[in-house]
Amino acid sequence: MLKFQSNDTTIIATFEDFILTTYVIIDELYHRFAPSEVRKRRHVLDAKLSDSEIITIALCGELVGIDSENAWFSFVKKNYRHLFPQLCSRSRFNRTRRALMQTTELLRQKLLSDFPVPISPYCIIDSFPLAVCKFGRARYCKVFRNHGADYGKCPSKKETYFGYKVHALITLEGYITAFEITPASTDDREGLRDLVDNCSNFTVLADKGYVGERLMQEMQEQNICLFALKRSNSKENWTKSVRQLIFKQRRRVETVFSQLTGQLNAERVLAKSFQGLCTRLVNKVLAYNLCIALNSIFNEPCELGKIKELIF
C-alpha cells in the first residue's frame, strides 16, 4: 500500500507540484502492477519518455481542460520541458498513450485498492450520454457506427443523440469504482448487470431507470441490495424517509458527472477512433479519482469533489 509519512508534503502549491506528485504515484503503481509484458516489451528502454511519464502527461492534460491533444502537447513542450527533457514526438506520444489504455485502466483499479482512502459499502449507479457527433452528421459517422454507436434518448436533456452511454458506479465519497461504455440505446439495467458482475455484499442506490422485479431478484442472489426509486404509479413505494435518503445521496452522482463533463470535458468527443475515445475516457476517470484521493489526504478541510482547488 502507498504510505504517507508525517514529514511528507501536505500542500500542492503549484500545478508543477501536482505534475510531480502525479508522476510519483503513477510510477509507483506502474512498477508494482503493470504486466511484465508491458514493462519489458521490446525497445521500451530506448523510448525517450517512460510509460509513467506518458500517463502522467495525459492525466494532467485532461484535468487542465485542454481537450485538444495537440494543443496540450505543445503547451507541455513550451512550459514544462524542464520536467520532461527527453520529450518525444507528438505522434509517438499519442500512439504509446493509446497502447497503454489497458494498463491505465489497471492502474485505476489498483489506485482505489492501494491508496489509503476511506471507501463506503454504498454505491450509486447512473449513466450519462456520450454523443460522438452532431445529430445531423450521424449517418456519416461510420467509424463509431462500426463499433456499436447508435441512437439513444437522453431524458434529462429531452433529446435524441447518436453515440454511446457511459454507465458508472460511484461511492458516496465520489470515487468511480467501475464504468463501461455501451451503445446509446442500451437499457440502464443492462449496464448495472455488467458493472456488478462478480461483485457482492454492498448496497446500490439508483433512480427510476433501474426499477424491475427481475433485476431486484438478480441483485438479491448476488447479495447486493438495490434501492431504486419507484415510479409515481407504483403500488408499492418506499417510505418518505427512504425516498429522501436516496434523493440526498444521489446528489453525489450529479456532482461527479458535472466534474467529468465540465472540468474534464467527458462529453466533448474529439477522438477519431473508438480506441482513442476509450483511452481518453479511461484517462479522465483515473485523473478524477486521483484528485479525489489527493484531496482526501492533502486538503482535509476541502470537500473531496473540489478538484479545481487542488490543481489551480
Describe the residue ranges of each PLM region.
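Short alpha-helical elements
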Residues: 1-312
